């Protein structure tokens, strides 16, 4: 069922609703673990990543889990909630557990913590969770840039960057985690220049 859903999402979201072009897809090694970190400007952003990677878990805002039916469907496809308004230790621990499920487990986190609509907010909003999880788990971050706020039937570029190693020793250093988080978000938006 999971593979069928991946194919369906690719056809509907990546070929019909939008025309998605992947750049740097060869940088994804599906035999490896990654903390996948894209920018976020569109509710459908996860559907551009879902078809191209294996064993993906997705961290999503807790608000979308209020509907029981929606929550049941999301959990079936390894989507789990995070409370964005406060430090959510439970979700952070669950994220690390997800990376330990299989040898090639992957975790999708939007490091901006939500959809960024205003272009003035680009590069200014970044949360530290992705870098902390990467440092704690020893799993590299894979930065990805997705075309911002595309119109329906428009071409969408999904640009994959080189993976980033986060030193394990910084996990207890708040300033270092913040520093690496800022570098990461800049790295993500710098990928836009490649297209």
For the regions a protein language model found, what residue spans apply to each?
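Short, glycine/polar-rich helix-capping loops at beta-to-alpha or helix-loop-helix junctions
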Residues: 5, 65-70, 151-153
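Non-catalytic C-terminal accessory region of glycerolipid acyltransferases
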Residues: 93-195
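Membrane-anchoring hydrophobic helices of lipid-metabolizing enzymes
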Residues: 1-35, 45-48, 77-79, 86, ...
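Short, flexible active-site-adjacent loop segments at beta-strand->alpha-helix junctions, enriched
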Residues: 26, 40-41, 62, 85-86, ...
